[in-house]
From Swiss-Prot:
This is Conotoxin Asi3a. Expressed by the venom duct. Its main location: secreted. It comes from the Eukaryota.
C-alpha cells in the first residue's frame, strides 16, 4: 500500500 498518513499530496492507502 501507499504511505499513511498521507503527506505532500500522496494518494491514500488502499484498504
Amino acid at each position: 500500500c501507499c504511505q499513511w498518513p498521507c503527506s505532500h499530496g500522496c494518494i491514500p492507502c488502499c484498504y
